[in-house]
Amino acid sequence: MDVKWLDVPEGDTEELKRNVFFTTLEQLKAWARSNSLWPLTFGLACCAIEMMGVGGAHYDLDRFGSFFRASPRQSDVMIVSGTVTKKMAPIIRRLYDQMPEPKWVIAMGSCATAGGPYVKSYSVVKGVDQIVPVDVYIPGCPPNPAALIYGINKLKEKIRYEAKTGKKVL
């Protein structure tokens, strides 16, 4: 970014270029949001055990600025893990609607992304993306905690990219 340095002595312009940070307000908000994600955990099966491992001392999701919340009104990310049944679908939708904007969804595991091994059952939803819009898919049965951290980091990149370019990433 070219800036005209008015009334600044020649030696001080290099010092200013090294120490002054230029950005837009949208990029600053996206940076703050991406570094303070508060996920709502919605564990329905064995993937939830791996999600609990992320909160433990070995992986410690807190060091990335993400703190698990029990209420959808305090969350901005919903992590859905496990088999979603048709009976559970309206509850997931209601929780998603209770979350404040902006909000994002992570589908964790084969069951949440595509129905998993129970996909041919009459009562299983063929992926949580049929209920709520999903931003990040994490494959695996079950995916390990490192994969969930990777997915959260990809969501952070997506938030920053959308603010920088103004384009919605699908």
Curated annotation (Swiss-Prot):
Q: Which residues form the signal peptide?
A: none
Write down the EC number. Answer: 7.1.1.-
The superkingdom listed in its UniProt entry is Bacteria
User: Which cofactors must be present for this protein to function?
Assistant: [4Fe-4S] cluster
Q: Give the molecular function GO annotations.
A: 4 iron, 4 sulfur cluster binding; iron ion binding; NADH dehydrogenase (ubiquinone) activity; NADH:ubiquinone reductase (non-electrogenic) activity; quinone binding
Q: How is the cofactor bound?
A: Binds 1 [4Fe-4S] cluster.
Protein's cellular compartments: Cell membrane
- UniProt entry tagged with the keyword Metal-binding: yes
A single GO cellular-component term from the record reads:
respiratory chain complex I
Main location group: membrane
Q: According to Swiss-Prot or TrEMBL, what is its membrane topology?
A: Peripheral membrane protein
Return the protein name.
Answer: NADH-quinone oxidoreductase subunit B
Q: Tell me which species this is from.
A: Geobacillus sp. (strain WCH70)
What lineage does the source organism belong to? Bacteria, Bacillati, Bacillota, Bacilli, Bacillales
